[in-house]
């Protein structure tokens, strides 16, 4: 093959990535108009479309390369030269880090996820660390309270690009100052200043102002979720100033933000200071660069593995009927493989399970469903696998693993954030912690349902507790849309002996769900039953679920808050308006 072909292929891949990220920015840039027009269904569609862009453009490039090479074989040396040329194109390229991930994706698509070695792929970045730490142009603007905080906040809100009128800007400013005074103290406030990101972060029905609050004691997050009333007027819903609150806002169980980021590495670096607990992968995930986040997640895994002598073990908790789950004892993620054969009561296929996981990836996760990264041909060193887990792998997923002697290759798996299974958590806590967990579980069910998601299997073992105490759903094999379910009341028994019979006295069709039955397994524990009846008894009524279905079918998109209701200004300081209240 002509030697110039390697450069042409490298340029074709980079141009393909340019096209992909250009479309990514184009979809993102429409977020302001969608927010201003309250086109919430378009918000949901844009989210799905943006996720699909990456794989679509990888496919286009792969087809181009097949035409360019004209079906001729390409040996290992040829491929290495392509990567060398590609690497030489990156020093002056502004989105070098994601361009490397795009190269990896094209390679994997071309070669069916095989021969994934550091020589052929960008397992680690080719660029020096300083490129990740450099912010080439200002991403934010500083505001100082030289003439008081009221004027400072007036300038910040007036500088926003939003074209809608404010409902009551002066009132919102008073609320923000009241919160800051309560949090920092009246004496400290004059010695603080704010740095605000140039771009708003859009998600669901809110436009988030993201900033840094510099105080005498350090830097805090400064987050203002801006909403619009039904009449099209803007208001600030709350002010968040702790790293824990910011971590939840940027959490792994939430949809990706729409934020215009032509220099994603610079934005990630800017965000680190107010999100110190987030990994690089989590930050890229939060701003919508989910494929590069997968690259960073794999790098974090490799770094952990290199510094640890731990062995892979089966994950704690009740063994799943569909998924085999394993982990490293000190690692904050789990590895999930679809079993070759499911338990008899699980009447579904592996393809159905994968479709459920893809549904979650594309849907609004409302802070209640864990995000996942999907991997193919995942290699494990057998010396790092506990013998009990190795035996379990051979028993449950023999069709998914290939034994290469010192290593095994797992054909397909998911990596997901590790949490404490809710059933284990409930066994370990008492008092207020128990009450909080039950409240969180019920809230998770409600918020998923309002987002048109029915979990299917609602047992506690299918939910996890995060480090912030939030309850998150993570078992997706029975997930479906709310609108696909037929919620029914159990008919009255015909005779007294009906209730003692082993079979129901009424017909049951596919898709039928009887909420009254939830009580049997959710309230069996005498510590939990009374709490559940107190806080979530309506979940046992079919009419509650049917009412939600009606709202969904009528086109209602519910508000989703990344903070407690009691933190809203309308609750803390007075009503904002009847149209602004959460449903």
Curated annotation (Swiss-Prot):
Location of the protein in the cell: Cytoplasm
The keyword Metal-binding is annotated on this UniProt entry: no
Residues binding ATP, per UniProt: 315-321, 336
Keywords, alphabetical: ATP-binding, Cytoplasm, Glyoxylate bypass, Hydrolase, Kinase, Nucleotide-binding, Protein phosphatase, Serine/threonine-protein kinase, Transferase, Tricarboxylic acid cycle
Gene symbol of the encoding locus: aceK
Protein name: Isocitrate dehydrogenase kinase/phosphatase
One Pfam family, short name: AceK_kinase
Record-annotated active site: 371
GO biological process: glucose metabolic process; glyoxylate cycle; tricarboxylic acid cycle
Family that this chain belongs to: Belongs to the AceK family.
GO cellular component, one term: cytoplasm
